[in-house]
Amino acid sequence: MGPHSMDVVVEGKRYRTAAATLLAGGPAWDERLGDEPRRLLDVRVGGLDLSAIVGDRGWERLGWQAFLFRTLKGNYFVQFQSTWPGERDRLLPLSQDEAMRLYGELPEKKLSFEEAFPGVEIEEA
């Protein structure tokens, strides 16, 4: 699943997925399912573990997909795609700090941290 084309105006700013740079993406767990998503796919029949048949991608169907973007002007936003019936995709502007936090949580990085957040100084731990 990849990002959908969206064009949304929020507080006088236009956010377009087609004109922005995709930084990262991946499953974003839906809180309605609790805080242990993989347990929902603990598939056992007669003691036989069938989780491998479902696979890691199976649990994407139980929540949201998130795609983090940066606009040409350096603003950040996230597109959420729901896998729940009747839910609509959403687009939300993010601060740079919120974007960096989400970037760290998303498993599929499209750019390195330095490319995704130009000008952010990284200090040694």
Task: List each language-model region with its residue ranges.
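Secondary-structure transition motif
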Residues: M1-A125
